[in-house]
């Protein structure tokens, strides 16, 4: 608009130049007319390119576009980026997918990782944890979330898994995203011959109840044996962690979750429940890299655990699994025989 306005003025003045020059020749007004003629013959020329360039050179323009104020200091929003030195493009994509989930939960990258030497959970940072990961051999997985930390801080529980398992987890995640997109578009998944994981019958999960009041001995022996045996068989398990007297095995809905947030427990009870959760995570993380958790520690928690894939290329693992099942059948048969002998002797 400014360009057209200037051009119009210049055209108007162009036809008036002759008259103005005659006016300027007048001796009386010679001094005054020189200023007018200088103004007319030195009008600035409008250059769109120069105008745009000068407009973008403002030192303060968009200065705070990617900043936020913190007191008197400006801080840039930083995004953690890890450069991998190993693995294929797909292996790196799978690891980056898990990394995004971790940072979404804890933006500083603080995690809890399983120490391979002690088999215990220890606090660490994802930057240091990833330095020792060779993606050609192992991938990473977020097996659970530690909600017991003080305040609003949540620590993802991370472990290394075989690269084959990491790639399967990534593939399952992409499939689930695709199915959700199809559902939003109104596509019936049943017609495509596929079914959402959430639509599977509850009977596909083995329900195991765990009490907050369970003793350390029962947790390490009886309950640990029950959990491990099911995972080794390839069964998916759902751990219902609740009070001893509760028999609630129903899913947790939004209303119940809101009610949980309003309840509270003592510090002593909170500490005990944290110990139970930590020991359960130590047990299941060795056999699974797909763990979902819902609920709150002050009421009840449901942990759904999908076992890792059995390496079919390893004959030793298949043989060991067969031997274990054989021993279980023999032990079961022996118990039946002893029970029958006891009943016969009493008669």
UniProtKB/Swiss-Prot annotation:
<feature type="compositionally biased region" description="Basic residues">
    <location>
        <begin position="50"/>
        <end position="70"/>
    </location>
</feature>
<keyword id="KW-0496">Mitochondrion</keyword>
<feature type="region of interest" description="Disordered">
    <location>
        <begin position="317"/>
        <end position="347"/>
    </location>
</feature>
<comment type="similarity">
    <text>Belongs to the AIM23 family.</text>
</comment>
<dbReference type="GO" id="GO:0005739">
    <property type="term" value="C:mitochondrion"/>
</dbReference>
<feature type="region of interest" description="Disordered">
    <location>
        <begin position="47"/>
        <end position="78"/>
    </location>
</feature>
<keyword id="KW-0809">Transit peptide</keyword>
<protein>
    <recommendedName>
        <fullName>Altered inheritance of mitochondria protein 23, mitochondrial</fullName>
    </recommendedName>
</protein>
<dbReference type="InterPro" id="IPR029427">
    <property type="entry name" value="AIM23"/>
</dbReference>
<dbReference type="Pfam" id="PF14877">
    <property type="entry name" value="mIF3"/>
</dbReference>
